[in-house]
């Protein structure tokens, strides 16, 4: 029987999955962290870290929340730079994105649904 609750550290628990804590890709033996409904990521990006490649035809809704640092999101519709703790960018299905950590940045990402 898998546990229906979990306590941990986001940086440690997400380490094997590039920061992802919750999602369909988490082994069901991890219990409540395995979900087809939502994905949650916590990650600290070093300054200059970037994903220059754009996502392609992503059909999920995404929220990226800045915990600290300076982080830019480029969207097919616009660009946004988050500079203050609590700044966020959210976009819906069909909008592609890339990103860059202008300074060392910790961000929390929430996407849904998890499996498309």
Annotate the PLM regions.
Residues 77-94:
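Short acidic-glycine-tyrosine-enriched beta hairpin
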């Amino acid at each position: 029987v898998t546990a229906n609750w979990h306590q941990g550290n986001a940086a440690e628990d997400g380490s094997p999955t590039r920061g992802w804590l919750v999602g369909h890709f988490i082994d069901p033996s991890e219990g409540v962290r395995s979900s087809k409904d939502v994905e949650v990521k916590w990650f600290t990006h070093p300054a200059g870290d970037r994903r220059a490649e754009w996502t392609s035809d992503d059909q999920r809704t995404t929220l990226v929340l800045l915990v600290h640092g300076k982080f830019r999101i480029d969207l097919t519709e616009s660009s946004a730079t988050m500079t203050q703790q609590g700044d966020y960018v959210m976009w819906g299905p069909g909008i592609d994105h890339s990103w860059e950590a202008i300074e060392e940045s910790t961000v929390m990402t929430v996407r849904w649904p998890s499996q498309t």
